[in-house]
Amino acid sequence: AYTCQELKIPATIFMPTTTPQQKITQVKFFGGDYADIALVGDTFDESATAAIDYARRENKTFIDPFDNPDVISGQGTVAVEIFEAARQEGIKIDLLLAAVGGGGLISGVSVYAKHVSPETKIIGVEASGARSMQAAFDHAGPIKLETIDKFADGIAVQKVGQLTYQIAKENVDELVNTDEGLISSTILDLYSKQGIVVEPAGATSVAALELIKDEIKGQTIVCIISGGNNDINRMQEIEEKSLIYEGLKHYFVVNFPQRPGALREFVNDILGPHDDITRFEYIKRANKGTGPVLIGILLSNKQDQAQLIERLAAFDSKFIDLKGQESLYNLLV
């Protein structure tokens, strides 16, 4: 979008209908009068297909967002700046991590990095719910994933490019993946400790450090933070996923005796002194001795979980921990 306005070249930019509003606003801001936005499809791949069809119908040039030599080269300039800064400081980079979606960034960065510093290890980081580059590595070529999770929407791609796959296969040393809970905790850490606002896709490289922390002690590491389009409206969701990942927030279905004082007993006997109830849903049933309650509990310390489970079992031996009930759990989180 910025290039369109800078070079005075009109363009139509296709994005999924699920694109966060903040990202749409930024595209409008940088594109100005030279960038029209078309929101089509629920995923990146559906939107890309629509863009290709539109370009054919209207006799326009389609520019792939990642599987294009010029796009790859442009993203590779990030590595040029990184290694030039390292050279000026006399620093040897042992490890470089970058997010992987369609593969444009990791391709451009890795091919330059291996040219100027062959000993630098390159790790590509995918979201656990959208491991399209790993699928390409496993099948000796790009394949389309049937479904993907769109939490890290900036890298939620069903199929990587042919060119990006070839470059990554040759230059990337390892692929790892990070789940949405770890990504969420990383987003909050970057904001609270460093004042950095980052979207889920942009946080993946830093999140991956948790996975390899025992292997990288004493090394010089660069994480490319690629994307700050974090819609403030998503922060509640991100905090929720982080608390669950950290083992602090839990959801249960517990059978309560249908008599006065049952809730008071639960609070006094089950909760720790610093624990909190974050959700409580209950409908009293007539002519029944007990009734199911959906309850969310926030612990002050994740080490208290085992004791909480023991007390819950004593209160209701048939209670349900919804973390093991994926279909129900996803309705809450």
Where do the protein language model's features map onto the residues?
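Buried hydrophobic positions in well-ordered alpha/beta secondary-structure cores of metabolic enzymes
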Residues: 4, 27, 63, 82, ...
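Catalytic phosphate/nucleotide-handling subdomain of diverse soluble enzymes
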Residues: 210-240
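A conserved regulatory-domain signal marking ACT and ACT-like small-molecule sensing domains
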Residues: 232-333
